[in-house]
Amino acid sequence: MAPNLRKSHPLLKIINNSLIDLPTPSNISAWWNFGSLLGICLLTQILTGLLLATHYTADTTLAFSSVAHTCRNVQYGWLIRNLHANGASFFFICIYLHIGRGFYYGSYLNKETWNTGVILLLTLMATAFVGYVLPWGQMSFWGATVITNLFSAIPYIGQTLVEWAWGGFSVDNPTLTRFFALHFLLPFMIAGLALIHLTFLHESGSNNPLGILSNCDKIPFHPYFSLKDILGFIIMFLPLTTLALFSPNLLGDPENFTPANPLITPPHIKPEWYFLFAYAILRSIPNKLGGVLALAASVLVLFLTPLLHKSKQRAMTFRPLSQLLFWTLVTNLCILTWVGSQPVEHPFIIIGQLASLTYFTILLLLFPIIGALENKMLNY
């Protein structure tokens, strides 16, 4: 009998073991769809980004008008741009839900998978930041100025580092060209990291909603989960296309319709919605270096979650106290996001400070304490 090419060919074998014959827990819910959704988001962003790059000019005098030209004169240029801009929002929605699922169901105990995932998040954040600068509107310019300036808080080497990043003494043409180069490069790095992420995941196999071993009950990935993923793609593309076609500027800042002007500062400098929680934490500390450290810690704290797991159970499915704490954390993040979009004045300052304190307290103190407490309760 002729060997099955899918199982014998060196390249097809890898695809087969990852997407076709992969043994998958039979009870994984729709929360496990977000990994594949992130993959399709990345593909969409690379495709639309490539098409946009063919019409973009990375020069301070031409960048803004080249984006306007793409929207006005290029066939479906407006649609490509709207899909790319809103696709970034959906990318972040998916990654935040993906992280939330990992946190809730204890998937972070696959340490290598979790750590590469956090590195992926950081790379995605960097990509989105440099990408936001490219249209060279007011918020692009001032966002780049404010965020890159944060590096000057690093003692001794800070100022040199910032000027090195800028390629001069302010955000200017060299900054824009290097940001374009980085924005082109980083998505391919994300794709490479995603493969590493998957390699680590397939070492141990997926977790499941019960947080228990599922070796006794696994089913092939195809056709069950391949079809489930395709359904997920359809469900995600519907709101994405609706947003891109009906209200493409809903999530953007109107300030970015004004070309960059170093002489006029916008009244409220704020990043896109998906960075607002971190921006609120940054602003809640009156000291520059302290704010930068808190900003970095707000994401880097994810590296510590596997070490802070004190419960005997993996998932939160049967841990009501941890569940309560988890949803408090989610609410807290929503409050931080809202505060980040508000001006720096009373009562937003104190709300932001309390929410920032709560964020770190829940993650670093309350979760391990409640985990240990639930262990005690199990013994009674």
Curated annotation (Swiss-Prot):
GO biological process: mitochondrial electron transport, ubiquinol to cytochrome c
Cellular location(s): Mitochondrion inner membrane
Binding site for a ubiquinone: 202
UniProt keyword Transport, yes or no: yes
Annotated family: Belongs to the cytochrome b family.
Note: Heme 1 (or BL or b562) is low-potential and absorbs at about 562 nm, and heme 2 (or BH or b566) is high-potential and absorbs at about 566 nm.
Role description: Component of the ubiquinol-cytochrome c reductase complex (complex III or cytochrome b-c1 complex) that is part of the mitochondrial respiratory chain. The b-c1 complex mediates electron transfer from ubiquinol to cytochrome c. Contributes to the generation of a proton gradient across the mitochondrial membrane that is then used for ATP synthesis.
Protein name per its UniProtKB record: Cytochrome b
Source organism of this protein record: Cepphus grylle (Black guillemot)
Gene name, Swiss-Prot/TrEMBL: MT-CYB
